[in-house]
């Protein structure tokens, strides 16, 4: 597995950066390699990526998500197999330090072509720059999902639970 770690500071509060990051369907607006993201359910997304003539799709499960803190995912597809974590931390200036850590498997082209690891590092850094330009340019998030996910399951907070015991429709 190849490890990638990139950090960027954005000049918006943690809540704003986190809220925008949870809007996966908006990623094509600022990430050049992301063509489409479908949010199948709160913990499952389908991604279409393209770089030059190369195009691929994969599904990712959100394993853990904590508002204003972090999001952990893993791909459900073998090629290319990967997992990652994005963390959000406040900076002294009131902005956000956003750190992406990924592990990318050797299967697929990354395991066969020399230099692909370095290209992947640069690609993640470039896409984070695009996120920075986007969120600082608009200054506010386009939406938010403030749910918590543990072990791939949405966890309802105590304040959301229906006290009477009568079933209710989930929110979020």
What is the predicted role of each segment?
Residues 7-11, 38, 48, 61, ...:
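Generic structural detector for well-ordered beta-strands
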Residues 61-63, 74-133, 137, 142-144, ...:
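Beta-strand/loop substructures that line and gate deep hydrophobic ligand-binding cavities in soluble
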Residues 1, 53-55, 79-81:
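Glycine-centered tight beta-turn/hairpin loop motif at sheet-sheet or coil-to-beta transitions
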Residues 45-51, 71-77:
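Short beta-strand segments that buttress and anchor functional surface loops
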Residues 1-44, 130, 136, 153-172:
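Hydrophobic ligand-binding cavity/cleft-lining segments
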Residues 41-43, 67, 92:
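Residue-level recognition of beta-strand termini and adjacent short loop/turns
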Residues 65-71:
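Short, surface-exposed linear segments at secondary-structure transitions and domain or protein termini
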Residues 3-7, 44, 57, 70, ...:
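Intrinsic-disorder/low-complexity, polar/charged segments enriched in Ser/Thr/Lys/Arg/Asp/Glu/Gln
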């Amino acid at each position: 597995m190849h490890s990638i770690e990139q950090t960027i500071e954005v000049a918006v509060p943690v809540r704003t950066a986190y809220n925008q990051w949870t809007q996966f369907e908006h990623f094509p607006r600022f990430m050049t390699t992301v063509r489409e993201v479908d949010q199948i359910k709160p913990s499952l997304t389908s991604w279409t990526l393209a770089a030059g003539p190369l195009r691929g799709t994969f599904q990712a499960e959100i394993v853990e998500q904590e508002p204003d803190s972090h999001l952990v995912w893993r791909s459900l597809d073998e090629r290319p197999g990967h997992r990652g974590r994005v963390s959000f931390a406040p900076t002294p200036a009131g902005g956000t330090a956003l750190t992406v850590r990924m592990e990318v498997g050797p299967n697929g082209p990354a395991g066969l072509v020399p230099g692909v690891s370095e290209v992947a590092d640069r690609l993640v850094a470039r896409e984070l720059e695009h996120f920075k330009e986007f969120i600082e340019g608009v200054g506010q998030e386009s939406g938010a999902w403030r749910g918590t996910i543990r072990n791939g399951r949405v966890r309802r907070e105590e304040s959301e639970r229906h006290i009477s015991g009568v079933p209710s429709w989930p929110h979020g």
